[in-house]
Amino acid sequence: MSTGRIIQITGPVVDVKFPSGQLPEINNALTVNQQGAADGAVDVKVTLEVALHLGNDTVRTVAMGSTDGLMRGTEVLDTGGPISVPVGEATLGRVFNVLGEEIDLQEPVAEGTRRDPIHREAPSFEELTTTTEILETGIKVVDLLAPYTKGGKIGLFGGAGVGKTVLIQELINNVALEHGGISVFAGVGERTREGNDLYHEMKDAGVITKTAMVFGQMNEPPGARMRVALTGLTMAEYFRDEQGADVLLFIDNIFRFTQAGSEVSALLGRMPSAVGYQPTLATEMGQLQERITSTKKGSVTSIQAIYVPADDYTDPAPATTFAHLDATTNLERKLTEQGIYPAVDPLASTSRALSPEIVGEEHYNVARGVQQTLQKYRELQDIIAILGMEELSEEDKLIVARARRIQFFLSQNFHVAEQFTGQPGSYVPVKETIQGFKDILAGKYDDLPEDAFRLVGRIEEVVEKAKQMA
C-alpha cells in the first residue's frame, strides 16, 4: 500500500502527493490517522475518496468526515480499493454511517462480516428481468391509482408534515409482514432528529429487525452526504443478488444527494453549469439510479423523497430525477385538512404501470373511472361554493355523492399509526380494492352514509360501520 502526504486542504477537499508511479485509482479510499501533538492537538481520523488526478503525482480527494485540525504534511495511506461497507444479515436492525461504521452504540458488527465496495457497475442487460411485476403495498390509493412495480423507482413528493415518514414506515411494515421483504433506509442530508425518531418508531412498531439504516445527515460534510446513498444501495444490492430478495430502498432525500455534489464540485475545480449545479449532475444521478433495478435474481425497489426547491419543477435537480422515475406519489396538504390519510392526491399521482397490458383491463377501467369521477367533482366544486348543491342537476348530484364516498374510501388506517389513532391498521389486497371501488362506481353503496367510508379497509367494513351508525 502506498503512502502520500497532504499538500493542500480546502474545506472538505484535500490534495495529496504520492511517490512517483504509486498513484491511487479514482474512487479509492485513503485513510488519514493524524496523532495529536504534545501541545493538546487532537487526534484526527478521516477517510478521503480520490476524485481527480491533477498531474505531478498529486490527487484531489473529498473527505468523508470533518477536516478540522488536519495539517499539511500528514501521512495518508492508500487502502487499495473503494470504501467498503458491511453487508448481509449482520446489517439488519443496525444503524451505520457512510463508511459502514456502527453509530447505534451497540456491539460492533461481527469480525469476518462480508464487506462490499460502494462503487460498482450497474447490472448488465443480460441480468435484467424483462417482465413487469406489480408490488402490492396493501395501501388502496397507491395500489389502485399509482401502482408500484418491483424494481421500480418511485418519487414521493410532499411538504413538511403531510405524512411522508408515516407512509414510508407503513410501506416498510407491509413489505416486511406481507412479503417477508427487507428494507434499507438511507437518510441523505436530512434532520438528525427525524432519523432518530424514525429509528425509535420502527423499533416500537417491530419492523427494525427487517431494516438496515444508513445516515449521512445535514451536519455531515458534503462528501458523506454525496456517498451515503451508495452505501445504502450497496447493502440493498447484497440482499437482491446473494439472497434473491425483493428489497425496498428508501432514500430521504434524493435532492440532498445532488446538493452535496454541487457543494463539492466547485472546490474540485469544475465549472458550474445551470443554476450553479455540477456539470456531472446527470451522470452522477444515472450512476446511482441505474443500479436500482430488477434482475433475474431479485429486485431493489426504491422510494425516494424528493424536495423541490421553491416548488420549481424545472430546477435541474428534480428535473434530472424525474427522468428516472416509474411512479410518483404526491402528498397534498388539503387532504390532511379534511382528515383523509394517507393524504395522497389521486389525480396528481402517476404510474407507468397503470396500463391495461400490465394491471389488466378491469383494474385499468376502475382506476380511470375513479379519476374521472374525482375530476368531475373538482370541476363542480366552484359551482357548489357559489350556488350551493341545490343548483346542480340530478346527475351531477350523484357524481358528487359518489366522488365524496370514493375520496373517503381512499383513506385507511395504518398499522404504524395504531399508537396515535387507537384504530387497528388494515392491509387491503389489490383484488378487494378493485372490487370495492367498482361497486361504489356502480352505485351499489349510494344509500350508505358518507362517513361510513372514512378510514376503513375493505368494503365489507363500510357496510359493518354503516350498520353501527344506523
Swiss-Prot record:
Origin: domain of life: Bacteria
Swiss-Prot/TrEMBL keywords: ATP synthesis, ATP-binding, Cell membrane, CF(1), Hydrogen ion transport, Ion transport, Membrane, Nucleotide-binding, Translocase, Transport
InterPro entries: AAA+_ATPase, ATP-synt_VA_C, ATP_synth_F1_bsu, ATPase_a/bsu_AS, ATPase_alpha/beta_chains, ATPase_F1/V1/A1_a/bsu_N, ATPase_F1/V1/A1_a/bsu_N_sf, ATPase_F1/V1/A1_a/bsu_nucl-bd
Subcellular location: Cell membrane
Positions that bind ATP: 158-165
GO terms of molecular function: ATP binding; ATP hydrolysis activity; proton-transporting ATP synthase activity, rotational mechanism
Catalytic activity line of the entry: ATP + H2O + 4 H(+)(in) = ADP + phosphate + 5 H(+)(out)
Cited CDD domains: ATP-synt_F1_beta_C, ATP-synt_F1_beta_N, F1-ATPase_beta_CD
Gene3D superfamilies membership: 2.40.10.170, Bovine Mitochondrial F1-atpase, Atp Synthase Beta Chain, Chain D, domain 3, P-loop containing nucleotide triphosphate hydrolases
Membrane topology annotation: Peripheral membrane protein
SUPFAM superfamilies to which the protein is assigned, alphabetical: C-terminal domain of alpha and beta subunits of F1 ATP synthase, N-terminal domain of alpha and beta subunits of F1 ATP synthase, P-loop containing nucleoside triphosphate hydrolases
EC number: 7.1.2.2
Family annotation (PROSITE patterns): ATPASE_ALPHA_BETA (PS00152)
Complex and partners: F-type ATPases have 2 components, CF(1) - the catalytic core - and CF(0) - the membrane proton channel. CF(1) has five subunits: alpha(3), beta(3), gamma(1), delta(1), epsilon(1). CF(0) has three main subunits: a(1), b(2) and c(9-12). The alpha and beta chains form an alternating ring which encloses part of the gamma chain. CF(1) is attached to CF(0) by a central stalk formed by the gamma and epsilon chains, while a peripheral stalk is formed by the delta and b chains.
HAMAP family membership: ATP_synth_beta_bact
Family designation: Belongs to the ATPase alpha/beta chains family.
PANTHER family linked: ATP SYNTHASE, ATP SYNTHASE SUBUNIT BETA, MITOCHONDRIAL
Functional note: Produces ATP from ADP in the presence of a proton gradient across the membrane. The catalytic sites are hosted primarily by the beta subunits.
Protein name per its UniProtKB record: ATP synthase subunit beta
The organism of origin for this protein: Shouchella clausii (strain KSM-K16)
Taxonomic lineage from the root: Bacteria, Bacillati, Bacillota, Bacilli, Bacillales
Gene symbol of the encoding locus: atpD
